[in-house]
Regions:
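Short, intrinsically disordered terminal tails adjacent to the first/last structured region
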Residues: 1-20
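Interaction-surface signature
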Residues: 98-113, 117, 211-308
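Internal/C-terminal transmembrane anchor helices
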Residues: 69-95
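Extended hydrophobic/aromatic segments used for targeting, binding, or gating
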Residues: 192, 197, 202-207, 212, ...
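Conserved, well-ordered alpha-helix/loop/beta-strand core segments that scaffold catalytic motifs
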Residues: 232-243, 297-377
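Membrane-embedded alpha-helical segments of integral membrane proteins
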Residues: 22-63
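Histidine-centered active-site loop/cap adjacent to the catalytic His
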Residues: 3, 20-21, 387-411
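Membrane/wall-proximal cationic-aromatic binding patches
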Residues: 96-194, 374-378, 384, 388, ...
Length: 411
């Protein structure tokens, strides 16, 4: 009786071990990357930079757990995407504008202007240095006190009532208000001090304002109620970004006055601008998910991205400035309205800056270019600004600008 030996298939233990190894590797990579991502979101100063690098490394590590050149090529190329995004995130994190923090109650809502500083208050303003990829904000860029008078205007120096040569009004945004500076370092304050008290200065500028608040303050009688001595000069400190604000093409509105222009050129106010809804809300995302995504500088940039301005927006802005000049001239005959124009702070504003220069000249409004007043400002503005990450004018810039204003007035 012969015994037939049947060849049994090879034990599955070897095959199982061959499959278990890659599967275990891939599972380990996925789980460890997920845990690392959660820890980064919880504790890291720039979580999405590290999170993206983690997943780039995970995809490249997964190449050792798959067979075949095509799967490996796909994983390699997929890993490039988060790696590139990590580079963008790193750049934005280290160059992102850091907002100031104000003491409670410093700003209050206003139906006309949108927001105003509280009257008769001393408010503290602080600004942290930018965060790094390896550290949270280290120290502060500035820690200053803003003194507001009984009219809600930034503190002005004493003036000689018996030898008063005139009153000078200032309008504008944080550049004229004096962001990050002590009271006596602002442009209006320096004009008063350097004149020896012969000129009284009134600073109607406020952080975030633009031409629309200047017009609203004049049209609604806010300026008229404050000014009790005939002003001889009015200076509007302008920036190209004011065009975006006047057209409502910024992510924040804060109930700012909204002006529109009719087909016949008539300018009128039509309600107010309000804040744009957060990107997560617009996309219908869960608030918790939106909060986590907001830890990404890329996400914040997308949510805060300003629309492009058009030639119509520039015309609207120039019309607002012109109307402001006309109302001041009607209320204070003989007043001289002038513009101090800062150059573009962002390359995207370059064309707008040039059109504003041409527009002011075309309207016959005297304009002083900061790039001409502050020597070397265009090529190297470092000595005239607060820091590399904050281009607001420093005390030196305002002292030189004040000298320019007084020379213009003396002519």
């Amino acid at each position: 009786m012969s015994v037939v030996k049947t060849a049994l298939p090879a034990t599955r233990s070897g095959e199982s071990s061959q499959l278990t190894g890659p599967r275990f590797l891939l599972a380990s990579i996925f789980v460890s990357s997920l845990v690392a991502s959660l820890l980064f979101l919880k504790f890291a100063p720039a979580p999405f930079f590290w999170l993206l690098l983690t997943w780039a490394a995970a995809l490249w590590s997964a190449m050792f757990g798959v067979k075949g050149s095509w799967p490996r090529a796909i994983l390699f190329n997929l890993g490039i995407v988060p790696c590139l995004l990590a580079g963008i995130e790193a750049y934005l994190v280290t160059h992102e504008y850091t907002p100031s923090v104000f003491s409670d109650g410093f700003y209050v809502r206003d139906d006309i202007m949108g927001w105003v500083p509280a009257k008769g208050i001393k408010g503290r303003a602080t600004k942290a240095n930018p965060i790094g990829l390896l550290h949270h904000p280290a120290g502060t860029l500035f820690d200053v006190t803003y003194t507001m008078d009984s009219n809600g205007l930034r503190a002005a120096p004493p003036y000689n009532k018996d030898d008063l040569a005139g009153t000078v009004l200032f309008f504008g945004c944080s550049f004229a208000f004096g962001e990050g500076l002590n009271d006596d370092e602002t442009l209006p304050y320096q004009v008063g001090v350097q004149s020896g008290g012969r000129y009284r200065t009134l600073n109607f500028a406020v952080n975030g304002y633009g031409s629309e608040q200047m017009l609203a303050a004049i049209a609604h009688g806010i300026v008229g109620r404050v000014v009790d001595s005939t002003p001889r000069y009015a200076y509007y400190v302008a920036l190209p970004v004011h065009v975006w604000r006047a057209a409502g093409r910024v992510s924040w509105g804060l109930h700012a006055p909204r002006y529109v222009q009719a087909p016949d050129g008539t300018l009128y106010q039509e309600g107010n601008f309000e804040n744009r809804k957060p990107l997560a809300v617009r996309l219908g995302l869960n608030p918790h998910i939106g909060g986590q995504l907001n830890k990404s500088a890329i996400w914040r940039m997308l949510g805060m991205h300003d629309s492009h301005v058009t030639d119509d927006d520039i015309r609207l802005y120039l019309t607002i400035v012109r109307r402001s000049q006309e109302l001041l001239a009607a209320e204070y005959p003989g007043i001289q309205f002038r513009v101090i124009l800062y150059p573009y702070q962002d390359p995207a504003q370059r064309a707008t800056y040039q059109k504003l220069r041409e527009g002011f000249v075309r309207m016959g409004i005297p304009v002083g270019l900061v790039e001409d007043i502050l020597p070397g400002y265009i090529t190297d503005r470092s000595k005239f600004i607060l820091s590399a990450g904050d281009t607001h004018p420093n005390a030196l810039a305002n002292r030189l600008l004040a000298q320019y204003v007084l020379k213009q007035i003396a002519r």
